[in-house]
C-alpha cells in the first residue's frame, strides 16, 4: 500500500506525540482565540516526540519530528511555506510514513492541523532527515530543542510579575479544534536557519499531546489535565 496518497483511506494509523510549539505571536495566539496574528504575519516551529504511533504495520514510537511554517500574512490568506524534519534514526519505511502523516496526506482533508496548514501553503521545502535533540516537560512548560544547523529553541513558563513564580495558564478546546483538546502555555525563543530562516523571542509557546488517526483528531482527555482530578 503506497504512502502519500490522500485517497487511500484504507491506511490505519495512529500519531500520538508530545509536542512543543513556538510561534511569533504574543501570549494570545490568534489561532487559538480566533483573532488576527500579533504582527500581521505568522511563523511557527512544531517539534514532537512519538509516545504512541504506527502507520499500518510500521511502528513509529520513539521517533522525533519537526514541522516549520512561515506565512507572509494571516494563515487563512495562504501563500505559506513549509519544511518537515524527520528523525534520522527512522528507517526508510518509517521516514515515508512520518512524512506522509506530517505532510497532511494521510487523513481526510482538513481533519487535523497538518492537513489544514498544508492547504494554506504554496511552497514546500525538501524534507530533511536529521538528529532532533528534544527535551520537553509538558506539565512543567519547559523545552529545549536543537536540530544541528537548522534550529535552536528553548521555552519556559511565563513568570508572574507580582511574585516571581511560574504563571500557570492552560487552554482547553472542548470542540472546534483540529490540533488539540488541551494545552499548557508558556513562552519560547526560537532561531531557524536555512530555507526557513526565522527568529522570535519570548513569544507564544504551547505544550500539548497531538493525538490523530486516519479520521482526524482523537478527542481523548489529555494526561496534562491530571491536576484537575477525576
Name each model feature, range by range.
Residues 10-55:
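N-terminal ordered "arm"
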Residues 23, 29-31, 42, 107, ...:
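Generic recognition of cysteine residues
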Residues 32-41, 74-78, 128-146, 187-192, ...:
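Short, surface-exposed loop and linker segments with low hydrophobicity and enrichment for Pro/Ser/Thr
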Residues 1-8:
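Short, Lys/Arg-enriched N-terminal segments with co-localized hydrophobic residues
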Residues 159-230:
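Extended, charged low-complexity segments
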Residues 40-111:
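Aromatic- and glycine-enriched beta-alpha-beta binding-site module
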Residues 57-64, 119-124, 179-186:
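Low-complexity, flexible helical/coil segments
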Amino acid at each position: 500500500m503506497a504512502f502519500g496518497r490522500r485517497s487511500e483511506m484504507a491506511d490505519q494509523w495512529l500519531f500520538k506525540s508530545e509536542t512543543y510549539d513556538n510561534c511569533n505571536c504574543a501570549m494570545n495566539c490568534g489561532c487559538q482565540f480566533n483573532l488576527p496574528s500579533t504582527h500581521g504575519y505568522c511563523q511557527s516551529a512544531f517539534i514532537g516526540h512519538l509516545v504512541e504511533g504506527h502507520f499500518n504495520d510500521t511502528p513509529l514510537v520513539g521517533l522525533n519530528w519537526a514541522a516549520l511554517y512561515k506565512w507572509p500574512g494571516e494563515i487563512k490568506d495562504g501563500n505559506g511555506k513549509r519544511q518537515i524534519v524527520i528523525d534520522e534514526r527512522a528507517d526508510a519505511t518509517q521516514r515515508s510514513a512520518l512524512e506522509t502523516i506530517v505532510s497532511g496526506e494521510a487523513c481526510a482533508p482538513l481533519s487535523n492541523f497538518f492537513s489544514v496548514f498544508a492547504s494554506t501553503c504554496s511552497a514546500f521545502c525538501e524534507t530533511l532527515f536529521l538528529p532532533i535533540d528534544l527535551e520537553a516537560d509538558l506539565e512543567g512548560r519547559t523545552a529545549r530543542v536543537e536540530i544541528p544547523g537548522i534550529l535552536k529553541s528553548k521555552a519556559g513558563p511565563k513568570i508572574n510579575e507580582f511574585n516571581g513564580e511560574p504563571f500557570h495558564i492552560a487552554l482547553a478546546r472542548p470542540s472546534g479544534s483540529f490540533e488539540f483538546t488541551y494545552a499548557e502555555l508558556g513562552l519560547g525563543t526560537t532561531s531557524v536557519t536555512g530555507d526557513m530562516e526565522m527568529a522570535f523571542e519570548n513569544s507564544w509557546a504551547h505544550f500539548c499531546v497531538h493525538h490523530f488517526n486516519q479520521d482526524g483528531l482523537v478527542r481523548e482527555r489529555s494526561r496534562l489535565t491530571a491536576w484537575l482530578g477525576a
